[in-house]
From Swiss-Prot:
Its EC number is 1.1.3.-. InterPro entries: Aldolase_TIM, Alpha-hydoxy_acid_DH_FMN, FMN-dep_DH, FMN_HAD, FMN_hydac_DH_AS. Residues 1-369 form the FMN hydroxy acid dehydrogenase domain. Its cofactor is FMN. Binds 1 FMN per subunit. The active site is at residue 261. FMN binds at residues 80-82, 109, 130, 158, 237, 259, 295-299, 319. The lineage of its organism: Eukaryota, Viridiplantae, Chlorophyta, core chlorophytes, Chlorophyceae. This is L-lactate oxidase.
Amino acid sequence: MADLSFLNLEEVEEEAKKVMPKMAFDYYSTGSDTCYTVGENRSCFSRYLLLPRMLRNVSRVDTSHELFGIRSSMPVWVAPMAMHGLAHPGREVATCRAAAAAGVPFTFSTVATSSLQEIQETGHDNRIFQLYVIRNREVVRRWVTEAESRGFKALMVTVDAQRLGNREADARNKFTLPPGLALRNLEYLSSASTVQARDSQDGSGLMKLFTSEVDDSLTWEFIPWLRGVTKLPIIVKGLLSPADAELAVQYGVDGIVVSNHGGRQLDYAPSGLHMLPAVVAAVRGCGSSIPVLVDGGVRRGTDVIKALALGASGVLLGRPVLYGLAVGGQAGVERVLQLLRSEIELSMALAGCSSVQQIGPQLLLPAPSAGPAPPMPAAQLCKL
């Protein structure tokens, strides 16, 4: 029986490292080049303090949340992540079932070891399909049409991976899919087998797959094309620049995820949390009220509260979910999500917030000794 006695999302990573093959753990845990951005995603949260308010009625704290008509037990979605089968035989199916049990939306990756049909059959109503855009638009159309027909609630288009980042751990390990696993959405592509082929000269099979299939000529004009083939909400994931956020609004997207791909693409890119206020300001400056979510480095309930206070509409949770899957399958993921929700609920109560809607910038102070934080508006300081 799996040991699910871990008490927080940092401990589950330690447990996952003990049980996962090195190639799989390195794939999940590392980033590109020096991995600076991986660390920055985590450390950025320490640059903010939380200023609690007292004598508020917190006898009942409501952590529930809704975006795009998608209900959640907390302001957290499971982020899109590739190849859950590397972590556990239950694959994405186990993760999706755990998300359903926790009342949390599940984002399903194009590069998955389960099929769209299998995810539909879990019975989880709140599913989002993450889309990598390959050169063959008919295949893209097929994915989108199938996702819509199988009841997925939105599309999340990843725009920061037109080329794969320099992931030296994968190259060193000559990353391949173990026997018995397949990229179920890519099986009809002739290049899909490259991710399973070891090559002592060329390193990671995943790098070769991306190079051969993903469209590195992609531009904003893809958004109108996609709008013409689906009625689903279109969320763009991977923006950091306020200028790109303005373009996203101009091209009519329905939501944005501020993200640096978990530090796995451009090293020394800023964290999503660092850029979040500027992106939100750019979107609102365009007169748009579309949701702006953020991911990267979330490990504590207080991290979620800080993100919401900085203007996030919601938060995506990535690596800890996979670590929970590795440690305990579906039960491990449920444990991760339960711990995070408990931390959010307690931290909200201690901060004097009885609902997610009460979380705002009035809760934040810059930490004096944790490195520079973005300046706070004078109007905000007057409310402290």
